[in-house]
Regions:
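Alpha-helix C-capping/helix-to-loop hinge sites
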Residues: 1, 18, 103-108, 128-132, ...
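Non-catalytic accessory regions of SAM-dependent methyltransferases
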Residues: 1-26
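Conserved aromatic-histidine-acidic binding/catalytic patches
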Residues: 2-3, 7, 88, 106-110, ...
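Short coil/turn segments at secondary-structure boundaries
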Residues: 3, 8, 27-31, 133-139
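Non-catalytic, well-ordered alpha-helical scaffold segments
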Residues: 5-13, 115-119, 123, 142, ...
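Long recognition/docking surfaces used for binding and targeting
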Residues: 16, 22-128
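Conserved S-adenosyl-L-methionine
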Residues: 135-255, 260, 267, 279-281
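A conserved structural/catalytic subdomain of Rossmann-like adenosyl-cofactor enzymes
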Residues: 226, 238-240, 244-430
Length: 430
């Protein structure tokens, strides 16, 4: 088998290479694995260049070039058959290409929806590969990327920025919304793809997947940059685009506070709103580095809303999260009431071997209920509340909602206390 960490690169490269008609016709010709890899890399290079990837081509080819280092795919001329125990001719790479060519790539022939289907397959495959928490990534669930766009409510002229763009999930959802708003204006759609979607990603593998992910949706000139989004050099480049909507899921449990990534995203926005999902420990902090960043954020921006998300949203990881919404470049007013939502039930349930799914089809109705109440700032018992807060307060609905004691039984009380203790231990809260 091929290691998980290599699978995403291989599948990504093949799906790009198959867009080259010459390669798609010739890959089935009997040839050595090393020659097939060489042909694949040449096909990838041609497709990247034809899509206007420019200087990014070299970076992407550096990542895809790792395929040629795989002993099983590119070097060994013979491979051991696990069933017979005999060495047979190595056709593993050709077989993988054929499977993708037959079962996945044909969707691109459907002009209006094909590349989106291909892109969705690709996104889900990346999610499958990087879903292993041992790889150090927490990818945003698809329905949450969609929710972000509904919270931010971009207009057709919005410029969207994600400074931790990963595989470009937020940018893809934003692109889809902006293009829908553009209607039949093809010139505007072109402008959206080329000028209104901005991303930064530091990891070379994630940067590669983000670029290819956008390209598979017809966006070959996306402004996704590789680099440190906290550096002034990169920020100056981003500010030139005058972004108006920030969307991000910063990396968790690194040496940099998640709130710092939000601060730098806001610093790059010309106006508008920033929506981010972060560990609950960040919004609860009343001391330490997260507390300091809470204070800095309120000195320059307005905390518009905080939503407490389902505890198992990032299952199988144990990260409990909250979505925060900031209005840009206006100091948090002394008398401003922040909206707090208790969004703990998104309708998804955990299923064996599949993870969390919208098994009962409740998500769309729940999402509309959440966003309608937020945009109209409705206070609803056991669901939402408005409060004036400072950096000294806990930024979560649970701290301000009235408790319905009729629902509290001894067993519920015991379970809640146990969950609370575990939560504080997991998040390092004293």
């Amino acid at each position: 088998s091929v290691p998980e960490i290599e699978r995403a690169t291989i599948v990504s490269g093949i799906l790009i290479g198959l867009q080259n008609k010459s390669f798609r016709k010739s890959y089935q010709i009997d040839k050595a694995p090393s020659q097939l890899v060489e042909d694949l890399l040449k096909a990838i290079e041609r497709v990247l260049e034809s899509n206007g990837m420019g200087g990014k081509t070299k970076i992407l080819l550096g990542e895809y070039g790792k395929i040629s280092q795989s002993n099983k795919l590119a070097i060994s001329e013979y491979i051991r058959d696990n069933e017979t125990g005999k060495d047979e001719k190595n056709t593993l790479l050709r077989d993988i290409i054929h499977e993708l060519d037959v079962k996945v790539f044909p969707f691109t022939e459907y002009k209006h929806i094909g590349y989106d289907i291909l892109g969705q397959f690709y996104s889900e495959f990346i999610r499958y590969v990087y879903g292993d928490k041992k790889l150090g990534l927490v990818l945003t669930p698809q329905h949450i990327t969609e929710l972000f766009v509904d919270i931010a409510r971009p207009n057709v002229d919005s410029v969207v920025y994600d400074n931790c763009c990963g595989t470009a999930g937020f940018l893809i959802k934003a692109m889809k919304r902006l293009i829908e708003l553009a209607g039949n204006d093809e010139a505007k759609k072109k402008h959206i793809r080329e000028k209104q979607l901005i991303g930064v990603e530091e990891r070379s593998d994630m940067f590669t997947y983000a670029c290819s992910n956008m390209m598979m949706r017809g966006d070959g000139k996306s402004n996704i940059f590789q680099g440190d989004s906290l550096s002034e050099r990169v920020k100056d480049k981003i500010k030139a685009f005058k972004p108006t909507v920030g969307l991000l899921n910063p990396p968790y449990s690194t040496s940099v506070s998640e709130l710092e990534f939000i601060y730098h995203n806001l610093d790059c926005l010309d106006s508008g709103v920033c929506v981010a999902i972060i560990p609950m420990s960040c919004v609860l902090a009343q001391s330490g580095i997260n507390y300091q960043w809470k204070k800095k954020l309120l000195e320059k921006h307005t905390l518009d809303a905080v939503f407490s998300m389902p505890d198992d949203l990032f299952y199988p990881t144990g990260t409990v999260t909250a979505i925060v919404v900031f209005r840009v470049k206006t100091k948090h007013p002394d008398n401003y009431e922040t909206y707090f939502g208790y969004w703990k039930d998104d309708g998804f349930i955990k299923t064996k071997n599949v993870g969390r799914i919208d098994y009962h089809g409740r998500w769309e109705e729940i999402k509309q209920y959440w966003t309608y109440n937020y945009h109209n700032r409705r206070e609803i018992k056991q669901h939402s509340v408005k409060r004036h807060v400072t950096e000294n307060d806990e930024w979560c609905a649970e701290a301000y909602m009235e408790t319905d004691y009729s629902l509290v039984t001894p067993s519920v009380f015991e379970t809640t206390v146990q969950d609370y203790v575990l939560f504080r231990l997991r998040n390092g809260i004293e």
